[in-house]
C-alpha cells in the first residue's frame, strides 16, 4: 500500500546544525567541517543505496564534490543564525524495486530542484521498517543561493515561499502516480489531507527512532502516545463505519489485503 510522505525543513545554525555534518550523515560518509575544524564521520551508517550531487547548468564542476560543496556553503554564511540548506525528505512506494525508486527520486530532484537552479545532494536510503518490510526513502539537501560559474550569489527568496512547498508536495504525488501507472502498479498516492479527500479519519503522526528509544528507556514520549491514540480512534471509526476504510483505501488501489487494512488503521 503506497503511503504519501513529503516533509520540508530548513537546516540552520540557530538549531545548532551544520550543513557539513548533515550531508555527511545522510550520505554515510566522512567529511571535514572546516568552519569548526572537526571531522564528521558517519561512514559506518548503513542503508544508503544511492548518493550523488546534482548540479544545475552553469554551476562550477568542483561543487559536485560533497565536502567542497557544503564547506563552501558554510563559508558563504556569516550569521550565527544563518539558514544553510533546505531538506526535502520523501517516501518512495514500497511497490517499486530499489532501482525504480532511485530513478524516480533522481527524476523528481532534477525536474523540481536542479532545473530550477538549486544544487541537490540526493541520498536514497533503504531501511527495514518495524513490520520487516523495506522502507525506501530519500533525503535531498538543497542550496539556498543562486549559483553560477563564479560560485554562490544571493539567496533566492522565491524558494522560501510557502507556495513552493505546496507545489513540491503536489508534484511529488504527480511524479509517483505517473511512474506507478507506467510500471502498471495498482497503487496511487494523494498529497491532499484526509479531510480534503473526504475521508473521516485523523492523520497519523510519525514516530521516529528517537521517540522509540525514549520509550524503551522509560522516558515519556508524547508523540508515541499520540500515535497510539490516533490509531485506536481511527480503528474505532472503522469498526463503527467500515465504509470509511473502504473509501480511503480504494482511492489508492483497486485491490487490497487484510494487511493493507491493518496498515491504514495503524
Predicted regions located by residue number:
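N-terminal nicking endonuclease/strand-transfer module with a His-rich metal-binding environment
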Residues: 1-266
Amino acid at each position: 500500500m503506497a503511503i504519501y510522505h513529503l516533509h520540508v525543513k530548513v537546516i540552520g545554525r540557530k538549531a545548532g546544525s551544520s550543513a557539513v555534518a548533515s550531508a555527511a550523515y545522510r550520505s554515510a560518509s566522512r567529511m571535514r567541517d572546516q568552519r569548526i575544524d572537526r571531522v564528521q564521520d558517519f561512514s559506518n551508517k548503513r542503508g544508503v543505496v544511492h548518493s550523488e550531487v546534482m548540479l544545475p547548468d552553469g554551476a562550477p564542476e568542483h561543487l559536485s564534490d560533497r565536502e567542497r560543496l557544503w564547506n563552501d556553503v558554510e563559508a558563504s554564511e556569516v550569521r550565527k543564525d544563518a539558514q544553510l540548506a533546505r531538506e526535502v525528505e520523501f517516501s518512495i512506494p514500497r511497490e517499486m524495486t530499489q532501482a525504480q525508486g532511485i530513478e524516480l527520486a533522481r527524476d523528481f530532484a532534477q525536474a523540481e530542484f536542479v532545473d530550477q537552479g538549486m544544487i541537490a545532494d540526493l541520498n536514497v536510503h533503504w531501511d527495514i521498517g518495524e513490520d520487516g518490510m523495506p522502507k525506501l526513502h530519500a533525503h535531498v539537501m538543497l542550496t539556498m543561493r543562486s549559483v553560477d560559474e563564479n560560485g554562490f550569489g544571493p539567496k533566492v527568496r522565491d524558494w522560501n515561499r510557502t507556495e513552493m512547498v505546496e507545489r513540491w508536495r503536489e508534484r511529488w504525488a504527480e511524479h509517483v502516480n505517473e511512474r506507478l501507472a507506467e510500471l502498471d502498479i495498482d497503487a496511487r498516492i494523494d498529497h491532499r489531507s484526509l479531510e480534503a479527500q473526504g475521508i473521516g479519519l485523523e492523520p497519523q503522526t510519525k514516530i521516529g527512532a528517537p521517540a522509540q528509544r525514549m520509550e524503551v528507556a522509560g522516558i515519556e514520549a508524547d508523540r508515541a502516545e499520540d500515535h497510539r491514540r490516533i490509531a485506536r480512534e481511527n480503528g474505532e471509526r472503522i469498526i463503527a463505519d467500515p465504509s470509511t476504510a473502504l473509501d480511503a483505501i480504494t482511492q489508492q488501489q483497486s485491490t487490497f489485503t487484510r494487511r493493507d487494512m491493518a496498515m491504514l488503521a495503524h
